[in-house]
């Protein structure tokens, strides 16, 4: 079989039997939609940066805390996600408000900005601000590129 737009390019012994089948009919134009980039776009209004994370299908609201060495999730949030903290390891934590007793548990998976992390040890402790479920610390943030675009009023969190 030989396809060409120039009959002279067909070898001479085969030209007499060549059949003009015409040009193919172009199909419909289908716009190519690029896949969404990995990561999360977060509205930014100049205040604390908040991000959604998922544990066991339950969405949690976490404050991005570049000053926190470890990720902390509240008792209530872990209970909503079905995480048993009774076998956790007792630890002492030190924060801006002083020292406190806490617990470390391992969560099987944390979905964040298109990335699946885990198992992941997290600190379990209460927070004064009950409108958030925890603090996203550097132990997790180190696996992401965080970019704040104040002029565009958004931040991005992209897995590295």
Task: Please annotate each region the language model reported.
Residues 1-160:
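Pepsin/retropepsin-fold aspartyl endopeptidases
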């Amino acid at each position: 079989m030989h396809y060409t737009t120039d009959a002279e390019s067909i070898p001479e012994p085969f030209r007499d039997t060549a059949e003009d089948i015409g040009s193919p009919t172009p199909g419909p134009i289908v716009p190519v939609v690029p896949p969404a980039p990995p990561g999360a776009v977060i509205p930014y209004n100049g205040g604390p940066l908040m991000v959604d994370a998922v544990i066991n299908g339950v969405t949690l609201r976490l404050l991005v805390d570049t000053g926190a060495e470890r990720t902390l999730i509240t008792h209530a949030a872990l209970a909503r996600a079905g995480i048993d903290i009774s076998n956790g390891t007792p630890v002492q934590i030190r924060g801006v408000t002083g020292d406190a007793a806490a617990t470390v548990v391992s969560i099987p998976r944390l979905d964040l900005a298109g990335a699946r992390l885990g198992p992941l040890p997290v600190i379990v402790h209460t927070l004064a601000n009950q409108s958030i479920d925890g603090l996203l610390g550097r132990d997790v943030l180190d696996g992401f590129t965080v970019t704040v675009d104040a002029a565009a009023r958004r931040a991005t969190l992209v897995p590295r």
